[in-house]
Design a protein with these regions (language model features):
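Short acidic low-complexity segments
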Residues: 40-51
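N-terminal, charge-rich interaction modules
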Residues: 1-32
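Short, glycine-rich nucleotide/cofactor-binding loops
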Residues: 54-64
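Class I S-adenosyl-L-methionine
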Residues: 109-135
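Short, intrinsically disordered, mixed-charge
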Residues: 39, 69-77, 103-107
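Mid-chain, well-packed structural core segment of small domains
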Residues: 64-96
Length: 135
C-alpha cells in the first residue's frame, strides 16, 4: 500500500534490497502498510545495531528523548532513523511534534532531512547522523 503521494512506503523510508531494518513500537497494521519489501530485507522488531533503516513510533516525548541516543547508536553512520508520531488531526494523545523531535535530536548529532506521511494517523521525520560526525 502506498501513502498519500502514491509512492510505496518502503521506497519513502529508503528500504533497499538487502537492508537491515527495525520497526519499533509499530502499530499492528504497519506490515500491511508496507506491503512487499525489496528482496533480502531483514526485519527486526527489536533495537539492534548495524541497521540501515529504523522506524520508531512514539507518542510520549519523554520516552522518545530517552530512546533517541539508542536509535542513533543503532544505525550505520549512513543509515536513517525515522521517528513517527501521531498527527494532530488523528486524535491520538501526544506531546510530540516535528519541532520537539528536532529539539531533542540536534544535540545528539542527528539532523532531519525528510518528512513523510506514513498513513492517516502517523507522520514520520527522517533523521541521519550529521555528515561531519560520520565515522
Amino acid at each position: 500500500m502506498s501513502g498519500y503521494s502514491g509512492t510505496p512506503l518502503p521506497k519513502k523510508l529508503g528500504v533497499k534490497e538487502g537492508a537491515r531494518v527495525a520497526w519499533l513500537n509499530a502499530p499492528d497494521h504497519f506490515d500491511a502498510l508496507l506491503g512487499e519489501l525489496p528482496p533480502g530485507v531483514a526485519v527486526s522488531r527489536r533495537l539492534g545495531t548495524g541497521l540501515d533503516v529504523l522506524v520508531q513510533f512514539a507518542t510520549s516525548r519523554a520516552e522518545l528523548r530517552r530512546r533517541l541516543p539508542k536509535l542513533r547508536d543503532a544505525i550505520f553512520p549512513d543509515g536513517a532513523a525515522w521517528v513517527s508520531w501521531p498527527k494532530r488531526a488523528s486524535g491520538v494523545p501526544t506531546d510530540i511534534t516535528e519541532d520537539t523531535i528536532r529539539e531533542d535530536a540536534l544535540p545528539l548529532g542527528l539532523v532531519d532531512v525528510k518528512v513523510a506521511a506514513v498513513d492517516e494517523t502517523w507522520s514520520g521525520l527522517k533523521l541521519v547522523v550529521r555528515k561531519e560526525l560520520r565515522g
